[in-house]
Amino acid sequence: MAQKDLYGRIQSFLTRRESASYFWKLRTQAQHKNPLIRYWARLRYHKLMLRNGSGIPYMTRIDGLPSFPHGIVGVFISQGAHIGENCVIFHQVTIGSNLIVGSKGYGAPSIGSNVFIGCGAKIIGGVHIGDNVRIGANCVVTEDVPANATVVLERPRIILHEETQELVESREIPNAD
């Protein structure tokens, strides 16, 4: 049983690493001059995106190979976004455009070099993320972040209403009448 578990862990690790490098290889081949190579690469690229539940258009401007420590599972990057060199992007990250014309955050994000984006983070709208920025897990960024900054979530707040508290204590369900 332990040997199966070890094999599964090794396979999972290799698959995650392989999918990230395979993603990069297909991404560059999808823009190849030869139409047959381009067609094959785009077909495989779309299959890789579907298999991982990801959405990273091959036309997205990415300056250098980003690091995907947990693979590209659930990563969505808008086509208009720009990502600098040496970025670390964890799973379930969304880097999306705001397409509501006239809104404050209209546009696509621009991310500098050496940026760390924690799992579940959302970067939305025409924001600029400076170089050497660290964005914590599950942060929602809708404003510009200066260089050498760290973005973290606000401390959680617990909101209790007296009526809700009484229901919890009595464990009674009120009638819908």
Regions found by a protein language model. Name each.
Residues R27, H70-G71:
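Short, flexible active-site loops
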Residues M1-G53, E163-D177:
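Terminal amphipathic alpha-helical/low-complexity segments used for targeting or macromolecular assembly
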Residues N52, Y58, D63-L65, P69-H70, ...:
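Left-handed beta-helix
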Residues I158-E162:
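A short beta-to-alpha transition loop/helix N-cap that caps and shapes the active-site region
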